A protein has these predicted regions:
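Conserved structural-core and active-site-/substrate-pathway-adjacent residues in large, well-folded domains
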Residues: 18, 55, 70, 91-92, ...
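Membrane-embedded alpha-helical segments of integral membrane proteins
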Residues: 21-81
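Soluble non-transmembrane domains of integral membrane proteins
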Residues: 112-439
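Short, membrane-interfacial amphipathic segments enriched in basic
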Residues: 1-6
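Alpha-helical transmembrane segments and their helix-start/interface "positive-inside/aromatic belt" motifs
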Residues: 7-26, 85-93
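Hydrophobic, lipid-facing residues on alpha-helical transmembrane segments of integral membrane proteins
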Residues: 16, 20-23, 27-30, 65, ...
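Internal alpha-helical transmembrane segments
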Residues: 56-128
Length: 439
């Protein structure tokens, strides 16, 4: 006894190849394209792809159009001379549809950046991935993240790392967080928030030298002609010294600083009148040309960028507006007084007047140990002039040994898990070409 209903395949074939079905799928396709066009205009191409163009529903509509074309041609077989134009047009549409399907399944969708005279062979693909690297073991795990437009819950585990949530478009909510790793008690890892204003604008700034601070919290910042430079607090007293050479030497590990005058070091000049200073260090000598580079020169006159001893020439920062911040202190060069000035910044206290454009700066928050972090929150992106001005953060929430961590495209995570160093990144899949391209 046959319990399955009898299917009239001929009726299904006639319906798919009918004008009625064609009108339905083309209408749905048109509606999807209209919605996608508006989304792409306001929220960006990536959001439109995730929300409309590359969703299973929209793909099924396009597949329905392809089936409609195929069955419309089949229903008009065997060939008739008066339909040769119909067969030609529909054959072309079928070829285009099959080509689009092959491109979607086996094609590569990505971008390659070509700077002038700089060859490149790496293509950044559209697929989001989370990359877990064990540097000491030379092992790397790559997991693909869902191609979704909104927050998605996940439940994937690798070793002791659980992937809990993925947010393709997020904005950061500022918070101070505890550091992941341990640091010496005297480590210079502070961060500060300032409020800057002048006659034309005002802005809140967050600067940090904490090694765990993300890319959005740097130690340098430029606002028009004015540059902000954030340094360890222990360097402030060296800036306050108006020593004749205007050179500072410091240890980048201990953040200790001194001037050549304090160590009775002689400033010499070359035949081309370039200043240099020689520092005895660890049974050897370090030669600095501070007006050209903070790093010492070796015997082959190559800079040693691995050296922990650096030299700083204050002369280089006297012509243009440069503000040096040391947490609770600020320094700048005063042309009217012809000297460097150091001022204290009281936490949430009175503002300090700067010598440029009637500018003022106020210290609004300062943390010696905590890390500045933008906790990701799901949002709808906003596009302006071809780039995202909101929602440009891609974030993954992890759970590692009972603790919650966030990894974003701006802030990779580096920590020890049961004695093993692990680096976790949220990034895009990359493809290396077998050849180079250049402009």
């Amino acid at each position: 006894m046959n319990l399955l209903p009898k299917i009239d395949w001929g009726k299904i074939e006639r319906f798919i190849g009918s004008l009625k079905f064609a009108v339905i799928v083309i209408s749905l396709f048109t509606i999807g394209m209209i919605i996608g066009t508006f989304l792409e205009s306001y929220y960006g191409t990536d959001f439109a792809n995730r929300a409309v163009y590359k969703t299973p529903a929209f793909m099924m509509i396009q597949f329905g159009i392809l089936l409609s074309i195929i069955f419309a041609a089949i229903l008009r077989l065997p060939p008739k001379k008066r339909l040769y134009g119909f067969y030609t047009i529909h054959s072309g549409l079928i070829i285009i549809g099959m080509g689009s399907l092959i491109t979607y399944v086996a094609g590569v969708d990505g971008q390659i950046t070509l700077a002038p005279n700089e060859p490149n062979r790496q293509v950044i693909l559209s697929k989001d991935i989370i990359k877990i690297t064990y540097p000491t073991e030379g092992k790397q795990i790559t997991s693909f993240l869902p191609f979704s437009a909104f927050k998605t819950s996940l439940n994937e585990t690798y070793d002791n790392i659980s992937i809990k949530e993925y947010i393709p478009f997020a904005e950061g909510k500022f918070a101070w967080t505890d550091p992941i790793n341990k640091y010496p008690a005297d480590a210079q890892i502070h961060s500060s928030k300032y409020h800057f204003k002048n006659a034309f604008a005002e802005q809140d700034l967050t600067l940090s030298i904490h090694p765990e601070a993300g890319q959005e919290f740097q130690s340098t910042l430029t606002m028009g002609p004015l540059s902000f430079n954030y340094y360890p607090a222990s360097l402030a007293h060296c800036f306050a010294q108006n020593n004749p050479s205007k050179i500072i030497l410091w240890n980048s590990v201990t953040a200790e600083c001194f001037t050549p005058e304090e160590r009775h070091l002689v400033i010499k000049t070359t035949g081309a009148n370039n200043r240099f200073v020689v520092l005895p260090y660890n049974n050897s000598f370090l030669t600095f040309f501070p007006d050209f580079s903070p790093f010492p020169m070796d015997t082959k006159l190559q800079t040693d960028e691995k050296s922990i001893i650096r030299a700083f020439s204050k002369k280089l920062f006297e012509e243009k507006p440069n503000l040096f911040l040391f947490g609770k202190q600020a320094a700048w060069y005063s042309k009217s007084e012809n000297k460097w000035v150091l001022k204290d910044l009281a936490l949430k206290g009175a503002s300090v007047t700067l010598p440029w454009m009637n500018a003022e700066i106020t210290l609004t928050d300062h943390q010696d140990r905590l890390v500045p972090f933008n906790i990701p929150e799901s949002t709808i992106p906003i596009q302006k002039n071809g780039s995202l001005i909101k929602g440009d953060i891609r974030a993954v929430r992890l759970e590692i040994l009972g603790k919650e961590y966030w990894v974003t495209n701006y802030s990779p995570l580096s920590l020890l898990i049961q004695g093993k160093k692990v680096v976790i990144e949220a990034t895009k899949e990359a493809l290396t070409l077998p050849f180079e391209l250049a402009l």
